[in-house]
């Protein structure tokens, strides 16, 4: 069984259990911030900074992290958005992390999870997310389209994550505003930064925002993403392990590169 299959099996169990529960995030009025608007106004590569305690590929990264403290550091360093891992079993995150972060910052917050059901989208929105992630590798195309439509009707922005040319082809059938190209193969967890370069050339970047995800460590990595047509990068482990956060942010915030199809 692949890593992804194992995660999805567990996620289905979680969803089934969740439907028997009632979660109350309280009466709050968290404004929905537009990530798309921020990206389109930026003159340099935008950065989505991720809060990630652990992962199946890296094990424990920083288990004792205070998500609010880390989120505030990210915002002060210049993050355009914050990604919060909410998967509990494999990434040691939670919806409580998402709620606390969304209340503490004034930039968009992404709920990063393996979403397979509408109830997860409801929970993400209720906890304060303004963006969610839908992974093509985790969903049949028809189900992906249903969840995409459901999320956008709730006023959420959606990152459609792909890793292969076939997934990208399927994603483009719904003309998404944002495509996330994951350099990490979710079946093997291997990383190849050339994935963004190879897939981005198939996307009209005048119509669709590209985000390069995974493996971003150096200015050269960020430059490769920008030259490939990405307007943003998602960075997790590099920042979670950083002892010089502001410096690392500045290194990765490279100029945008105009590219036409």
Curated annotation (Swiss-Prot):
Disulfide bonds: none
Pfam families per the UniProt record, alphabetical: IGPS
Enzyme class label: lyase
Keywords, sorted A to Z: Amino-acid biosynthesis, Aromatic amino acid biosynthesis, Decarboxylase, Lyase, Tryptophan biosynthesis
EC identifiers of the protein: 4.1.1.48
Pathway entry: Amino-acid biosynthesis; L-tryptophan biosynthesis; L-tryptophan from chorismate: step 4/5
GO terms, molecular function: indole-3-glycerol-phosphate synthase activity; phosphoribosylanthranilate isomerase activity
PROSITE patterns: IGPS
Keyword Lyase part of the UniProt annotation: yes
Family annotation (InterPro entries): Aldolase_TIM, Indole-3-glycerol_P_synth, Indole-3-glycerol_P_synth_dom, Indole-3-GlycerolPSynthase_CS, RibuloseP-bd_barrel
Catalytic activity entry: 1-(2-carboxyphenylamino)-1-deoxy-D-ribulose 5-phosphate + H(+) = (1S,2R)-1-C-(indol-3-yl)glycerol 3-phosphate + CO2 + H2O
One Gene Ontology biological process: L-tryptophan biosynthetic process
PANTHER family: INDOLE-3-GLYCEROL-PHOSPHATE SYNTHASE (PTHR22854:SF2), TRYPTOPHAN BIOSYNTHESIS PROTEIN (PTHR22854)
Family: Belongs to the TrpC family.
Name used for this protein in its record: Indole-3-glycerol phosphate synthase
Protein source organism: Oceanobacillus iheyensis (strain DSM 14371 / CIP 107618 / JCM 11309 / KCTC 3954 / HTE831)
Gene name of the record: trpC
């Amino acid at each position: 069984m692949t890593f992804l299959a194992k995660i999805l099996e567990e996620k289905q169990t979680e969803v089934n259990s969740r439907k028997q529960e009632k979660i109350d995030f309280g009466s709050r009025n968290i404004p929905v911030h537009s990530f798309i608007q921020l990206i389109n106004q930026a003159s340099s590569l935008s950065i989505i900074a991720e809060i990630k305690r652990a992962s199946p590929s890296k094990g424990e990264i920083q288990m004792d992290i205070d998500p609010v403290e880390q989120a505030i550091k990210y915002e002060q360093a210049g993050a355009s958005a914050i990604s919060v891992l909410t998967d509990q079993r494999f990434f040691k995150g939670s919806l409580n992390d998402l709620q606390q972060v969304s209340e503490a910052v004034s930039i968009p917050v992404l709920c990063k999870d393996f979403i397979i059901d509408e109830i997860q989208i409801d929970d993400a929105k209720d906890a304060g997310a303004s963006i969610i992630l839908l992974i093509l590798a985790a969903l049949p195309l028809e189900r992906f389209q249903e969840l995409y439509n459901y999320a956008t009707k709730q006023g959420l922005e959606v990152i459609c994550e792909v890793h292969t040319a076939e997934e990208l082809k399927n994603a483009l059938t719904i003309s998404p505003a944002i495509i996330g190209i994951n350099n990490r193969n979710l079946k093997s967890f291997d990383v190849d930064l050339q994935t963004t370069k190879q897939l981005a050339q198939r996307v009209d970047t005048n119509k669709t925002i590209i985000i390069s995800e995974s493996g971003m460590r150096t200015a050269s990595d960020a430059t490769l993403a920008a030259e490939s047509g990405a307007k943003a990068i998602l960075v997790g482990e590099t920042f979670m392990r950083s002892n010089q956060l502001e410096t690392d942010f500045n290194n990765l915030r490279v100029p945008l590169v105009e590219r036409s199809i």
